[in-house]
Amino acid sequence: MELQTIRPNLVQAIRAYRVDDLMSAADAAGQHFLYANLSTAQSKQDVLDGIAAAFTFPAHFGKNLDALFDCMTDLVHKSGPQPGFVVVLEQLPDNPRFDREAREQLLEVFRDAAEYWGERRIPFRCFYSFQ
């Protein structure tokens, strides 16, 4: 699989792709591969903690959606030229503590990040699945 066959700067369900294939494709393209398995997360805070740990966010990460956006965009942008990103959020919770509205708010942050990187002509692809 080659990343060129997947439209850049999007957020979509992982259905048609395997995590290992996405990781290999990111590696072959020289892009960052960011993976978070959120199978034990039950709440918004659990999800943010899981993403922060998996993506090795700095200790000062504010653990809210604004801070998530900052870590996915501005903080990375300031660290120098970026080759592109493949992000996988696997097993997002689907329960009353992390309901559809919470999932949409989280995915909107990643859509905004995709737009941010797209404006800079940097590919950003985010894939997700639910528990």
Model feature map: region roles:
Residues 1-131:
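Positively charged, polar, low-complexity stretches
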